[in-house]
Amino acid sequence: MADVRPRVLAILPALFPSTIIGVAKPLLRLHHDRRIVLDLTLQYLTSRRAVARADVVVLCHTIDPQYGVILDWARELGRPIIYEIDDDLLAVPDDIPGLAYLAEPARQAQLVACLRQADIVRVYSPALREKLSAYSANVSVVSGPLDWSLMRTPALKRDGLVTIVYATGRTQDRVGAMLVAPLGRVLDRHPGVRLTVWGARHDALMSHPQVRSLPLVRDYDTFFERFSREGFDIGLAPLRDDEFHRGKSNNKFREYASCGIAGVYSDVCVYNTSVEHERTGLLVPNDDRSWESAISRVIADPELRRGIAERGRAYAREHFNEAVTDAAWMHAIESVDRPARPGRAPSSHSGSSPGELDKALGLARFLGKLAGQVTPVLREHGVRVVVQRTWQHVQGLGQFAAWLLKRRQLERRINARRSGGSGPVAEPGVSHRTSH
């Protein structure tokens, strides 16, 4: 019997939370459920043959200019592209450390080329859809993903303390700076409150006896399991109101609401298009006094906290789940004009993705290219530069090995869940907590 499932080639720039959560996990689930045949790979391992074998090409986030040939291959072979972008990469600010490479002219040009060529562009922000519609006629806003299997039941609280969390993936955190002064005043007035700052470090708060600092956890699954287990009462989500940040997703609302945490959010379009003020969260203007007042209010009113937590969690259950995420991906895949294909033999149903030979050949080409560069670089720049560049490439190979391991881990997790081996999903609702 012919295998008519669409073949999807998903090409990631690297493994980081948004590419794993938004692209890799849902597509691996669809592959395991036998709705698609997935080849999941990285940009520098992609070959023309892999593109030719696909019915649909999925790209996400940024496109390294040296791999822009992927767009050429897709165009020449008539392969449709679905492009997912969860940040406004056309408006990268110069005051956020580590993002300067995204603003390089060649990378910006590659981004625009991808937007113009893509058959479907997926975003998580209405503001970003409006902006990117200047480059593509088919930009859709989708609900953010959430992996409920990562939920853990928090321990019963008996100390009567109100716990607040501010969590961010930014170690150098300019956004959270707006909270430092109001939080300092709130903590001084409320000795029964404990604040956890997770991921960032704000020295003005770290010396306060009611503040706990936790380091950034780079593996998102590990982070979210620990986060859900903590049983925080109040979550803070500040956000700047500028062009770049208006393109963000409502990730903190998803995290806080799903964990039964009463969230306090900046009153900006990222949040006020999904958070209902005083029902599923509090929306706050970005000034010191407003933040101080809102945090104090939710500390002092346990009924408000409880109501926000319960309604927020119900909203998250309905709108942020695997069924919604996977259906949106399947709709996009089925909506594009795929090339006509002769009947194919059914693919083996296993966790492994097709195209392993192509990946091995891609790695071999990569290593061969490096070997050919050693002598010219040695002549022109000397031993020191050769050693530096060699070390960079060794690190790259380490990342490749880590990629293979992580992909297998994702596949095993999804296989176990689909086979019923992971046990029931924890339900850490507000009933696990004492009221304050």
Per-region residue spans from a language model:
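N-terminal pre-catalytic "stem/leader" segment of glycosyltransferase-like enzymes
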Residues: 1-65
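Conserved catalytic-core segment of nucleotide-activated headgroup transferases in glycan assembly
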Residues: 10, 14-32, 145-153, 157-230
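Membrane-proximal helix-turn-helix segments that form the acceptor-binding/catalytic region
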Residues: 89, 101-120
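Donor nucleotide-sugar binding/catalytic pocket of nucleotide-sugar-dependent glycosyltransferases
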Residues: 116-152
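Nucleotide-sugar-dependent
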Residues: 220-221, 225-258, 264-275
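Conserved acidic donor-binding segment of nucleotide-sugar-dependent glycosyltransferases
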Residues: 277-278, 282-289, 297-303
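A short, well-ordered alpha-helix in the C-terminal region of glycosyltransferases
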Residues: 297, 304-319, 331, 348
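C-terminal amphipathic helix plus adjacent low-complexity
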Residues: 317-318, 323-425, 429, 436
